[in-house]
Amino acid sequence: MPFFGICYGFQWATVEFARNVCGLDGADSTEVDENAPHKVIYKLRDLLGVDDLGGTMRLGRYECELAKGSIAERIYGTSLISERHRHRFEFNCLYEKELAEKGMRVSGRSPDGKFVEIAEMPSHPWFVAVQFHPEFQSKPIKPHPLFASFVEAAYRHKSGKLEHVGVKGSRVQVG
């Protein structure tokens, strides 16, 4: 079954993967448990100590570099994208290697390498989780590439034809 996690969905996908696949008991987000033994998601480092509600977010449009050969790169058709953000918490890169060893790959990050923006599972036919908000750039007659690909994957899953992202012959036209 296709999975598409957006913002909080990205955060919980990584936490659940850490808990249930990597076996990290107590893996959590500091938004839920500040004393979690495995802080997979934590408050943005640049915002620690900032109490002004409006000043505690990563807000606006930011560039993201996509990993070569990733599901995301195939969907977007490019290796550099620009997406809009609205969040206070981020993925803790200390867990990147452990998650990757079990099958969850970081496939998009900020150009400075500081922020993880996209996680995916290459062994899964369609599993993409993003920290940003693609809905901010989607329109009824011009859907965002991630939504178009997700809907196509759901259609293919229902009809028993879902294999992997990047299958030619898409019924969904983007652009």
Predicted regions and their residues:
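Acyltransferase
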Residues: I81-G175
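Cysteine-nucleophile active-site neighborhood
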Residues: M1-E63, G69-I71, P140, F147-K158, ...
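Surface-exposed charge patches
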Residues: I71-R74, K97
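Short, exposed beta-strand "edge-strand" segments with a Pro/Gly-rich flavor and a Y/T-containing core
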Residues: G60-L66, H85-E90
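Alpha-helical context
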Residues: L48, D52, I75, P122-W126, ...
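Short, glycine-/aromatic-enriched active-site segment of Class I SAM-dependent methyltransferases
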Residues: Y76-L80
